[in-house]
Amino acid sequence: MTSVVVVGTQWGDEGKGKITDFLSADAEVIARYQGGDNAGHTIVIDNKKFKLHLIPSGIFFKEKISVIGNGVVVNPKSLVKELAYLHGEGVTTDNLRISDRAHVILPYHIKLDQLQEDAKGDNKIGTTIKGIGPAYMDKAARVGIRIADLLDREVFAERLKINLAEKNRLFEKMYDSTPLEFDDIFEEYYEYGQQIKQYVTDTSVILNDALDAGKRVLFEGAQGVMLDIDQGTYPFVTSSNPVAGGVTIGSGVGPSKINKVVGVCKAYTSRVGDGPFPTELFDEVGDRIREIGKEYGTTTGRPRRVGWFDSVVMRHSRRVSGITNLSLNSIDVLSGLDTVKICVAYDLDGKRIDYYPASLEQLKRCKPIYEELPGWSEDITACRSLDDLPENARNYVRRVGELVGVRISTFSVGPGREQTNILESVWSNI
């Protein structure tokens, strides 16, 4: 029984897809356990970029099984489009499995997402308007439609009529918006269900059978710990649990079967949308990092907010996700800076604190306390070991590991697979 969970430790966009793709080479099953098509991940293979939103990164290994678990909310329209995209690129999807217990995102979820966001005015949380939150709301309210329901014509029709009647009352009475028509949704989405039917199964059986047989299973999270609905910067969070604990709920695999948790982070910090960001940069250094790091959302295209590495955030993520190994990405983006900074603590009303406050009001008053390190001017994109790095870059990597309190297993100096360097195999000693 061998399993590894990959989680983002910041606000998403840490390079989880790249690391999952890298670790997939030694895995036999790769599974997603939460989120939806609001999260994008980019994989570079032979200098060609592939952008995915729903399908696990492991799909590019045709001999390995890729799983969309029950904790994922699936937009069938987006999924069919993504399948067509992969087929057009010559990628087989015969190795894909989709949980029959996963919930479905429908047009009324997306419409409600937009209406709710617009109604917030200046208090918007920066949702991607993909219907993720409303779909999870329906799931919690026990009125959601699951993949198993989508495949049954009569069941789907009955539940769609009930849900649509309720949502239309909401649209008309509360938001003064036009209702949606049953006929505009039913046939289209039922057909999407038929197109994905070949992939649908009880994925908890596949995952547990694989683990019981001693196979290596890799779990791929979406977003990041700081976007977790319980442990993140609430309410500026997603509607699911990206933390490692979300694996057990979102995949149907018990906690006793999880061996290691790899936390993925960048050598700096970024986030999309609104919400607290203590180390955010508003100067030329921030602009430089954004442009060199190509910090624009995979899903939205929005410019990401960027800032210095925050070890307070990272220690919070380590604690709530039980991180055992760290993968440090995008070190190359910091090349050329005279000085690099790491936030080691916060100043809250004149008092030094080492924890991440839950209160948004306290976070607004938190000022980062920085440790400054000398930068490096060398191009490090061809470095293939820690010893290859310039001394200052090497010291930066080591200091990050010390402050977070987790050993660094891999570090990357660019987007390519060959630019990911192993310091310690996460598959060993399990």
Curated annotation (Swiss-Prot):
Comment on bound cofactor: Binds 1 Mg(2+) ion per subunit.
GO CC, alphabetical: cytoplasm
Residue sites binding Mg(2+) per the record: 13, 40
Keyword Transmembrane part of the UniProt annotation: no
Enzyme Commission number: 6.3.4.4
Keywords assigned by UniProt, alphabetized: Cytoplasm, GTP-binding, Ligase, Magnesium, Metal-binding, Nucleotide-binding, Purine biosynthesis
InterPro entries: Adenylosuccin_syn_GTP-bd, Adenylosuccin_syn_Lys_AS, Adenylosuccinate_synth_dom1, Adenylosuccinate_synth_dom2, Adenylosuccinate_synth_dom3, Adenylosuccinate_synthetase, P-loop_NTPase
Gene Ontology terms, MF aspect: adenylosuccinate synthase activity; GTP binding; magnesium ion binding
Main location: cytoplasm
Coiled coil: none
Binding site for IMP: 13-16, 38-41, 128, 142, 223, 238, 302
Membership in a protein family: Belongs to the adenylosuccinate synthetase family.
HAMAP family referenced in this protein's UniProt entry, alphabetically: Adenylosucc_synth (MF_00011)
Function (record text): Plays an important role in the de novo pathway of purine nucleotide biosynthesis. Catalyzes the first committed step in the biosynthesis of AMP from IMP.
Protein name in UniProt: Adenylosuccinate synthetase
Organism per entry: Streptococcus agalactiae serotype V (strain ATCC BAA-611 / 2603 V/R)
Lineage, top ranks: Bacteria, Bacillati, Bacillota, Bacilli, Lactobacillales
Gene: purA
